[in-house]
Amino acid sequence: MPRNASVRARSFAADHRSGCSHQTLHTKKTINAVAAPRSNSAPRFRETEFADYAGIMSLLARHGLSTPGIEQWKYLWLGNPSYTRQCPLGWVMEVDDKLVGYFGNIPLAYELEGQQVRAASGRGWAVDQDYRSFSLYLLHAFFSQSETDLLLNTTANVRGEAAFCSLGGVPAPNEITQESAFWITDATGFSELFLRRKGVPFHSVLKYPVAAAASVLQHIRQAAPGKMQVERFAGFDEKFDRFWNKLRNEKRAVLLGRRDRATLAWHFHYALKKNNCWIFGVVQGRELLAYAVFDRTQHRELGLQRMRLVDYQSLADLQPLAAIISLAIRCAKEAGIHMVEVAGCRIEARVKKELAPFTRPIRATCLYRAPHRALAAQLATPARWDTSLYDGDSSL
């Protein structure tokens, strides 16, 4: 067990150990046993070490994936409140001392019905073409963790989803729509980027009129928040700890990722450091009633900049999202960002009514595997899920 297990909240696995639906497949000491027969070119599998950084970044770059700096990469674990030394950093596949495969492993903390759910999210799964037939060994190692109650994959492509499900993973039965809502905040720049790209039909740009920016501002005026005051925060303070204690009680019946001050500060540390993060909240007196966090992303080919909603939480029946998005749209326009987007989460009907966004189809998938029968039974119910880009590694 992790060293700090005695001071942790009650663990789901501790209360339901007898309900485990399978035996752990392979421990970290026997990962090599599932590899191919040994030969000069047969891959070897082992746990990731921090010293693997250069090899992993080279591999990720070959596959067009993001390559963070070494300090940012290490911070995924060393700055993570949920990380212990017993938690694997991930697994690598190597041939002749060259890394040809990688599967990252990020520990996360969740709660459900007052019990701690120890989760892990996959990250950065990449395997060189010549060794794709061994890809499932990396996923197998991820599934074989013995100190984890819930395994998540929120960024899988179609092939990755098929592989995840082939080993027992399933899509979360959430009610997330397969479309995003967005507002154009720099109509001229938005159109120019698309017209510069070869093969983009002109009519696809005309769907989003040049007058969109003026239209957005008009909708903002129509959606005046009245007495609801939305503020912008420079970071996460003690109000977020108090808010989290209230939120976890109100949403006991929902699988909820930890959102205390320390965890939020870790999750958004580098986004804040690079001025790519906006934190908005509704405050009454000294208390936080709702908050939303947006980050900035850029399309690699187009250069299109988006401000996207990552996390939104609200107490009781308060519905401030329309007012928050209105302020986000203003900030995006001032920052020269092309669009504001809400995707991968439930969108309040009030937002669509008051702010009249454009929409586009997307692929929003949250895959999971719960080894313990009791937790698996609970998570089979749609009401247990309320996912967003905060979950898994979607915004790390």
Question: Each predicted region: which residue ranges?
Answer:
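Conserved N-terminal entry element of GNAT/NAT acetyltransferase domains
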Residues: H26-F50, A212-E238
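A conserved beta-strand-loop-helix scaffold within acyl/acetyltransferase catalytic domains
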Residues: R46-W125, R232-Y312
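Active-site/acyl-donor-binding loops of N-acyltransferases
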Residues: N32-P37, Y75, P81, L150-S215, ...
